[in-house]
Amino acid sequence: TPDYSEVAKLADLWMHPKQGTDAAVAMAMGHVILKEFYFNKRSSYFDDYARRYTDLPLLVVLEDKTLPDGRVVKVPGRYVRASDFVGQLGQANHPDWKTVAYNVDGQVALPNGSIGFRWGQDGRDDQGLWNLENKDARQGNTVKLKLSVLEDGAQAHEITDVAFPYFGGIDTPNFNANDQGNDVMLRRVPITYLDLNGEGVAGRVAVATVFDLQVANYGVNRGLEGEGADGGYDANAPYTPAWQERITGVPREQIITIARQFADNADKTHGKSMVIIGAAMNHWYHCD
């Protein structure tokens, strides 16, 4: 909180970003956590949790988009769904609400428990399969979903540029901008191709995992072809601790320390780290 409140005076560490810049704080913390707990040394707890209970392994369609300057780039679109495949992966009940991922063997998996399994007519084939379990819903066999196509035995892939929007350079009356020279960031992302025939997608379609897209958006350097040198936490590049310092006023060293401690505690306690928002965004929109 930017206010030295009753809560702040009792805290071990008080971080006071400029009002309204907490998103930049969160992005920089995410950058540190991804780099140190997923790449420098993978947390086994985070790895298992991310594969089983998050959307990080799920596949996303990459679409071609023409920028105002005429360049054609790939951008993240929607999730790949069972309805995009010929035969709908055998799903008669809401296949357009069932997401897919890669198993560690490189084959497409239909994870048990996505939203498409949660309602439908009584007596349907997938009735009762709404639990999030590490199983393929078709045969019930155990699966281990891939976070990245580069891991668990890298499968055939390409490294290509994917475009992400950048809003940190917008000048406003009340906030410091951090101009990076462009409002579109091109990041290197490993992609694969699937033969699809669904709504808005047909033929050989480029896809990527949410994890690979998220890591790229956060600016975490993985040493991919064409990625360039890693400037570290002191580089003024989007979402690094140094980048947020220019926007929030919070020293980069404090961001690094808090991110490490927050993630380390979550790792050791299996998830017992919490962000308590208080009477803010969750005070409105029917959250009272």
Segments and roles (model prediction):
Residues 1-6:
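Short, polar loop motifs at secondary-structure junctions
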Residues 8-9, 13-262, 268:
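Long, well-ordered, tryptophan-enriched scaffold segments
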Residues 254-288:
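Acidic catalytic cores of enzymes that act on phosphate-bearing nucleotides/polynucleotides
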